[in-house]
Amino acid sequence: MISTDAVAPAVDVKGEAGDRAATGNIFLVGMMGAGKTTVGRLLSHFLEKTFYDSDREIQKRTGVSIPTIFEIEGEEGFRRRETEILSELMNARNIILATGGGAVLSGVNRAMLKHGGTVIYLRASIDDLWRRTRHDKNRPLLQTSDPRARLAELFVQRDPLYRETAHIVVESGKRSPRHLAQSLAQQLTISSRTG
């Protein structure tokens, strides 16, 4: 079981991160099933920013699904495409970007995200992630004989990278996406005013 003791359940946005968020880009990182796309869409509405999902952008440009890319090009090919999309989107302004769960595996991606805007890590427990992803066949990394164990392995590998990259860590498991997005929007707006 993964402990959540070190993660504050409340949203706490202060100083420079809040300023970047109010005037620039916001990048959501976290595991598959953490709510990046759902919360990102809602947050973009509340903050009047344009929403992008890096996986959807890759699918639009290639014309095929993520599992198909994994099948043809492998994870390495997919990660290369992911870095290209992130690099392009770094030139955009006033956006909210939901990244793929593995975007932080690349040091180049972590640096781009960290310096390109405010990075928010949506963190959820393994149980919550499993509940949200267990029936989803569009998760190539979970197409194994023991997908829950694979999810736990990925979490252990990626959690430190998300933390390293993030300016803000938010527990996403127990709150509704709408409530979480509203809370984030309010805190980011307040922080940008009080600096």
Swiss-Prot record:
The protein's name: Shikimate kinase
Entry annotated with the keyword Cytoplasm: yes
Disulfide bonds: none
Cofactor note: Binds 1 Mg(2+) ion per subunit.
Reported cofactor(s): Mg(2+)
HAMAP family assigned: Shikimate_kinase
Catalytic activity: shikimate + ATP = 3-phosphoshikimate + ADP + H(+)
Primary residence: cytoplasm
Residues the entry annotates as binding substrate: D55, R79, G101, R158
Subcellular location: Cytoplasm
A GO BP entry: chorismate biosynthetic process
Classification via Pfam families: SKI
Keyword Cytoplasm annotated: yes
Assembly and binders: Monomer.
Residues given in the record as ATP binding sites: G33, A34, G35, K36, T37, T38, R139, R175
Pathway recorded for this protein: Metabolic intermediate biosynthesis; chorismate biosynthesis; chorismate from D-erythrose 4-phosphate and phosphoenolpyruvate: step 5/7
GO CC terms in record: cytosol
Lineage: Bacteria, Pseudomonadati, Pseudomonadota, Betaproteobacteria, Nitrosomonadales
Keywords of the record: Amino-acid biosynthesis, Aromatic amino acid biosynthesis, ATP-binding, Cytoplasm, Kinase, Magnesium, Metal-binding, Nucleotide-binding, Transferase
Single annotated GO MF: magnesium ion binding
